A protein has these predicted regions:
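Generic secondary-structure signature for well-ordered alpha-helical cores
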Residues: 17-22, 51, 100, 126, ...
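Buried hydrophobic positions in well-ordered alpha/beta secondary-structure cores of metabolic enzymes
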Residues: 16, 94, 155-157
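Ligand/cofactor pocket segment of small-molecule handling proteins
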Residues: 91-129, 133
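Extracellular/luminal Protease-associated
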Residues: 63-105
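Intrinsically disordered, low-complexity regions enriched in acidic/Ser/Thr/Pro/Gln residues
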Residues: 1-63
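General beta-strand structural signal in soluble alpha/beta enzymes
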Residues: 24-27, 48, 74-76, 102-106, ...
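Acidic, glycine-rich flexible loop/linker segments
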Residues: 126-163
């Protein structure tokens, strides 16, 4: 959900740092498709692991068929997967189901298409190939670690064009 009156993420990070806390996820996460105004969502955490066998990412399609209103999807652990775990099709599905945005601790693809959709996507980088069956969704709504920061289910996430 976009919100007027919410300070920029950089200001929130500065206040957290002054308090001796962490909580910001950039870098290495950066906007692939940045939110033009501060956007808030409650974390829906998803753990992705690299493994040649298992259910693959099939469970994410079931997840994306439900109501995601106000949720910020946080995909943790995907950096080990040798390919993109997020792209245009998942972006379209998440937006249609009401999600606020997605943070991928891994690779994404289809930047031009995702930009046209206008859905906030943050990742560590881009990759042209998909996961080729080597990405497994192993947990949903558990505490995850992204860039040494713990993110629990329902934590408040704020993103903007800067991060």
């Amino acid at each position: 959900m976009t919100c007027s009156g919410v300070p920029p993420v950089s200001a929130i990070a500065d206040v957290l740092a002054l308090w001796g806390d962490d909580g910001w996820l950039t870098p290495p996460l950066h906007p692939v498709v940045g939110a033009p105004v501060p956007t808030i969502g409650r974390a829906l955490t998803i753990t992705i692991t690299f493994a040649p066998t298992g259910p693959g990412l099939e469970p994410i399609f079931e997840l994306l068929s439900g109501d995601l209103t106000g949720r910020m999807l946080v995909l943790a652990g995907a950096a080990a997967v040798p390919g993109a775990v997020w792209g245009e099709l998942l972006t379209r599905a998440a937006r249609q189901r009401g999600a606020s945005g997605v943070l991928v601790d891994g690779w994404v693809r289809d930047r031009p298409e995702m930009t046209a959709i206008g859905f906030p996507v943050y990742a560590i980088g881009e990759h042209v190939v998909g996961p080729n069956g080597q990405a497994q969704l192993t947990h949903i709504d558990t505490t995850v670690t992204v860039n040494e920061v713990c993110v629990a289910a329902d934590d408040v996430i704020v993103v903007d064009a800067g991060g």
